[in-house]
Curated annotation (Swiss-Prot):
This is Formamidopyrimidine-DNA glycosylase. It comes from Exiguobacterium sp. (strain ATCC BAA-1283 / AT1b). Its EC number is 3.2.2.23, 4.2.99.18. It comes from the Bacteria. The gene is mutM. Its cofactor is Zn(2+). One of its GO terms (molecular function) is damaged DNA binding.
Length: 275
């Protein structure tokens, strides 16, 4: 699943490609993608709207319209591809947006798990899904003290599963939680409440650093992720533990191990991240 760095990269590529363009028509080839409205009504609301910006909130892509927002979540395999001219949809193309200049935006999704829905300016941040999200790691309101207070209430919850909770800390998925905890020197099974203030500060600091580095490198392509230009990310070349099971730790030489935690594959170095 694309995580925050990948979604941020997608937004940065889409912004210059679609901003300022007016929607002439929309073809919904698979109605399963559309949420909240009948597909015909959904299309009716979009025609004539101009995309004024492309924003991101957590892992959601927000197409800012003249009136409201088109909210998209890529889930496992969703991808957007802009084309300068009309282009035939391929097997896994599920939505085609045609603009008045005859350029198009295709949404492709092999797994069909992605979603699109409309929100008004008034409801975009006050109704699910965005209303359920916490602050992002970059937000100045995410202080060490505030995060420490939240984690102190989690007496039995592992720090790994706590950081994956988007109502606690938005934008960290499996890859970047594993990398954050490695860099912070915190074992993933530690109870969240057991972390000292200093450890929480390291986790917060490293989370921001990991995400910024991943964004700079276009995200991580582990399986099939590609941005709207078709380019793959390169941060996977910098991963210390994720996907490195059985390899020597680049810091200490100990073998990287993998376990299941909360149903998620979890990678760590037992020497650098002691319990």
């Amino acid at each position: 699943m694309p995580e925050l760095p990948e979604v941020e990269t997608v937004c940065r590529r889409l912004r210059p490609a679609v901003s300022g363009k007016t929607i002439q028509s929309v073809d919904v080839l698979d109605p399963k993608i559309i949420r909240g409205l009948d597909p015909e009504e959904w299309v009716h609301h979009l025609i004539g709207e101009t995309i004024t910006d492309v924003e991101r909130r957590g892992k959601f892509i927000l197409f800012k319209l003249t009136n409201g927002y088109l909210v998209s979540h890529l889930r496992m395999e969703g991808k957007f591809f802009p084309y300068e001219t009309a282009t035939e949809p391929v097997k896994h193309t599920h939505v085609v947006i045609t603009f008045t200049d005859q350029s198009t935006l295709h949404y492709n999704d092999v797994r069909k798990f992605g979603t699109m829905e409309l929100r008004t300016n008034e409801t975009i941040h006050t109704t699910p899904p965005l209303s359920l999200l916490a602050y992002e790691p970059f937000d100045e309101r995410v202080t060490t003290e505030a995060l420490h207070r939240r984690l102190e209430r989690m007496k039995t919850r592992a720090i790994k599963t706590a950081l994956l909770d988007q109502s606690i800390f938005v934008g960290l998925g499996n890859i970047y939680v594993d990398e954050t905890l490695f860099r912070a020197g915190v074992h993933p099974t530690r109870p969240a409440a057991s972390l000292s203030r200093e450890e929480v500060d390291r986790v917060r600091t490293e989370a921001v650093a990991v995400l910024n580095e991943a964004i700079e490198r276009g995200g991580s392509t582990i399986r099939s992720y590609a941005d709207p230009d078709g380019a793959t990310g390169t941060f996977q070349e910098r991963l210390y533990v994720y996907g490195q099971t059985g390899e020597p730790c680049r810091r200490c030489g100990h073998e990287i191990e993998k376990m299941k935690l909360g149903g998620r594959g979890t990678h760590y170095c037992p020497h650098c991240q002691q319990r």
